[in-house]
């Protein structure tokens, strides 16, 4: 199957991971993180914050887009946030492998959302969350402006967001950010063999 990982010696990520494992072992109390979103506490809220930032940017006439690649989408709060962003004019591309409770292309609700599922012999298993972040505002220690991209283990499902420890890490290297955005764009391209989800 296919997946993504980050091999890094970045001390900020190393410190975050140390805090996370100390928290899991009971050695440390509830921790805060610099470059991680960790379920069940901050993945849903962190993603919805960034979706709302794109919604605000679109309403202000600025560049606004969201690109998501996951296994499944069933979380109602996240879906509602994506619907509101679509209604504001945010262009949303989603590549998903399995269950999708979101309905794309519904006039007045989700006409700016496209959903694709790759057809092929490899099991798609990577998760990517990318946001235009055209000029902020900065959320946490994220970039003040420019694309913000996260990879990790969390799908948009209740079990991932509420009942498991899952982590997303923010990518900071410009070349890696560009590569991940192009990866999603390639999977969304008309030339890629994929199943297209319609409003019905």
Which residues are covered by each model-predicted region?
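Polar, glycine-rich mid-to-C-terminal structural blocks
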Residues: 2, 6-37
């Amino acid at each position: 199957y296919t997946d993504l990982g980050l091999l890094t010696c970045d001390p900020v990520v190393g410190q975050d991971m140390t805090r996370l494992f100390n928290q899991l072992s009971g050695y440390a109390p509830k921790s805060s993180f610099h470059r991680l979103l960790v379920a069940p506490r901050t993945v849903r809220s962190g993603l919805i914050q960034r979706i709302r930032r794109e919604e605000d940017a679109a309403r202000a006439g600025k560049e606004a887009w969201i690109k998501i690649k996951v296994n499944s989408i069933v979380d109602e709060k996240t879906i509602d946030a994506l619907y509101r962003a679509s209604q504001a004019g945010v262009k949303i591309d989603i590549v998903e492998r399995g269950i999708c409770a979101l309905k794309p292309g519904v006039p007045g609700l989700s006409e700016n959302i496209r959903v694709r599922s790759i057809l092929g012999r490899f099991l798609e298993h990577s998760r990517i969350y990318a946001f235009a972040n055209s000029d902020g505002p900065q959320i946490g220690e994220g970039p003040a402006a420019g694309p913000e991209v996260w990879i990790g283990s969390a799908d948009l499902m209740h079990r991932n967001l509420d009942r498991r420890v899952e982590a997303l890490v923010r990518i900071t290297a410009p070349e890696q950010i560009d590569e991940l955005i192009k990866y999603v764009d390639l999977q969304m391209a008309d030339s890629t063999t994929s199943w297209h989800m319609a409003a019905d």
